[in-house]
């Protein structure tokens, strides 16, 4: 059963993501609601997780709308366009990430998220 992650940013932007049924994500259910400081890196929003996930990065070339775990920073990353590492419109992660799912609602609103904005994260099973 997949996970639904709701992201409510202090600017009023709301994004809903669906993550795969990855056993390691059970750790997020223990902290099913938390706040974090969102950061922007080009057209990527990322924020630190309250628990460390034991997942290894697999790739850097991403697709618009993909959600991934960044092991180096213990962050969840949402790609919605080119990043500083991109050569064209395809998002490229800073280092290898583990793809976990997709944005299913609000992808276009991510451009309105500011650097260091607070995000309220809610995680539940579908």
Q: Which stretches of residues belong to each language-model region?
A:
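A short beta-strand micro-motif
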Residues: 3-10
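Glycine-centered tight beta-turn/hairpin loop motif at sheet-sheet or coil-to-beta transitions
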Residues: 10-12, 73
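Short, contiguous acidic and Ser/Thr-rich linear segments
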Residues: 13-22
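Glycine-rich active-site loops that engage anionic ligands at enzyme catalytic sites
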Residues: 21-24, 32-126
């Amino acid at each position: 059963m997949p996970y639904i992650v709701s992201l409510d940013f202090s600017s009023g932007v709301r994004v809903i993501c669906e993550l795969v049924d990855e056993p390691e994500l059970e750790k997020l259910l223990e902290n099913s609601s938390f706040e974090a400081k969102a950061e922007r890196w080009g057209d990527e929003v990322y924020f630190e997780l309250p628990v460390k996930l034991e997942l290894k990065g697999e790739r850097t070339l991403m697709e618009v709308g993909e959600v991934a775990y960044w092991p180096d920073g213990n962050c969840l990353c949402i790609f919605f366009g080119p990043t500083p590492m991109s050569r064209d419109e395809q998002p490229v992660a800073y280092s290898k990430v583990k793809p976990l799912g997709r944005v299913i609602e609000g992808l276009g609103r991510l451009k309105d998220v500011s650097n260091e904005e607070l995000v309220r994260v809610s995680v539940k099973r579908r």
